[in-house]
Amino acid sequence: MQEEFGRNLTYGLQNMLGRAIVVGEYADRPFPSEADIIKAHGISRSVTREAIKMLTAKGLLSARPKQGTFVRPQEAWNLFDPDVLQWLFECKMSLDLLRQFNELRLGVEPEAAALAAKRATPAQHDAIDEGLRWMVDAQRGRYDMLKADIAFHVAVLRASNNAFFVQFRDMVATALHVSIRLTNHVAGGTANIGEHAAVRDAIVAGDAALARTSMRDLIHSALVLMERANEPERT
């Protein structure tokens, strides 16, 4: 039991059941009852109920009185939840899903960059610049490119000083773990430092229109790389 779920039994059970739901394990059979889960994994009733409660809050499950617990359709899932998004990318990863995510980024990050150009503080400028420096270091083998790229994009979201845009940070970070690995692989293991620098420069200069355009160009480049990665699947 401890080995199966790690040190936190509730989160371990949540992750196991969440992945099973996302991969479609219960598409053709009922979701197990509370008693069945307890028996199968040797865990307490309180741990089981808490894990199911967490999955219900994420939109994956629905409990009906005297009928049991059911898996909800995918359109009901909270795709903005980092756990749900991670399970989707881990268990059901597809280029189409990544493409949809980057299309969402086109509607969020350019506007966040424009707001950052108007509102960012000197400290937030420094955070964006630090992310860019880490990317340069990563190209020289002195830092992790994935962490650097995520740090840059999260810093821009925070610099928007808009609470709603900032809420996208965990979702963006989670999905970029997959997206950046794919696009950097297609690009030969490098990120486009120049396009990231253009975003940074526009924000520091206070040019909202240029910041918006530069971020849009950066994300569009990622979409182009995804299309290149998709070419072998079409042949």
Regions found by a protein language model. Name each.
Residues E34, N161-A163, G206-D207:
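Short loop-to-helix capping motifs
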Residues K53, A117, D137, L157-N161, ...:
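Amphipathic alpha-helical interaction elements
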Residues N78-A155, G194-D217:
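All-alpha effector-binding/dimerization core of bacterial HTH-type transcriptional repressors
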Residues M1-G107, A114, E233-R234:
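Short linear motifs at protein or domain termini
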Residues L132, V136-D137, V166-T235:
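C-terminal all-alpha effector/ligand-binding and dimerization domain
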Residues E25, R119, Q139-Y143, A163, ...:
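Residues at alpha-helix boundaries and short interhelical turns
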Residues P73, Q100, Q124-A127, F164, ...:
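Residue-level recognition of specific faces of alpha-helices
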